[in-house]
């Protein structure tokens, strides 16, 4: 028989740098999960993606066991890295902070495709372009 799911916890943690300190500790502690076991397993799984923020979905079961699924980094993080900027623009329509090529957009869209609500790469590219525009990043050919 399948285990009963008690909670699904979603967090965004830097790859390979999870610690029992907030936000991880309190989020998992309230469900009685072994925090150190999660931290150790998460850091092992994400060690090769150092420097990126990795969203993770943790499913907590009735017997206090857990499973987790890592997702692809947020589109905004990938765009910031591609444009070589620290943060997006506070006034995206007035002040542009960087440029990204369509080829880079396609690369990001292909990486994010499995996590996006899109059927093909073209639709995913349009979503990523929209994110870029809202951050004040110019999309050039």
From Swiss-Prot:
Alphabetized Pfam families for the sequence: Ribosomal_L11, Ribosomal_L11_N
InterPro entries, sorted: Ribosomal_uL11, Ribosomal_uL11_bac-typ, Ribosomal_uL11_C, Ribosomal_uL11_C_sf, Ribosomal_uL11_CS, Ribosomal_uL11_N, Ribosomal_uL11_N_sf
Single GO molecular function: structural constituent of ribosome
Keyword presence, Ribosomal protein: yes
Keyword tags: Methylation, Ribonucleoprotein, Ribosomal protein, RNA-binding, rRNA-binding
GO biological process, one term: translation
Post-translational modification: One or more lysine residues are methylated.
One cellular-component annotation, GO: cytosolic large ribosomal subunit
Assembly information from the UniProt record: Part of the ribosomal stalk of the 50S ribosomal subunit. Interacts with L10 and the large rRNA to form the base of the stalk. L10 forms an elongated spine to which L12 dimers bind in a sequential fashion forming a multimeric L10(L12)X complex.
Its job: Forms part of the ribosomal stalk which helps the ribosome interact with GTP-bound translation factors.
Family statement: Belongs to the universal ribosomal protein uL11 family.
Name this protein carries in UniProt: Large ribosomal subunit protein uL11
Source organism per UniProt: Carboxydothermus hydrogenoformans (strain ATCC BAA-161 / DSM 6008 / Z-2901)
């Amino acid at each position: 028989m399948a285990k009963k799911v008690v909670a699904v916890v979603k967090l965004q943690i830097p790859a390979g740098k999870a610690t029992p300190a907030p936000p991880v500790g309190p989020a998992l502690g309230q469900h009685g999960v072994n925090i150190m076991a999660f931290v150790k397993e998460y850091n092992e799984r994400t060690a090769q993606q150092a420097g990126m923020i990795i969203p993770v979905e943790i499913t907590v079961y009735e017997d206090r066991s857990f499973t987790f699924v890592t997702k692809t980094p947020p589109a905004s993080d990938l765009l910031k890295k591609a444009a070589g900027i620290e943060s997006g623009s506070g006034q995206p329509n007035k002040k542009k902070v960087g440029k990204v090529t369509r080829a880079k957009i396609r690369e990001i869209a292909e990486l994010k495709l499995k996590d996006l609500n899109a059927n093909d790469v073209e639709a995913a590219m349009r979503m990523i372009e929209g994110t870029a525009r809202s951050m004040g990043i110019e999309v050039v050919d």
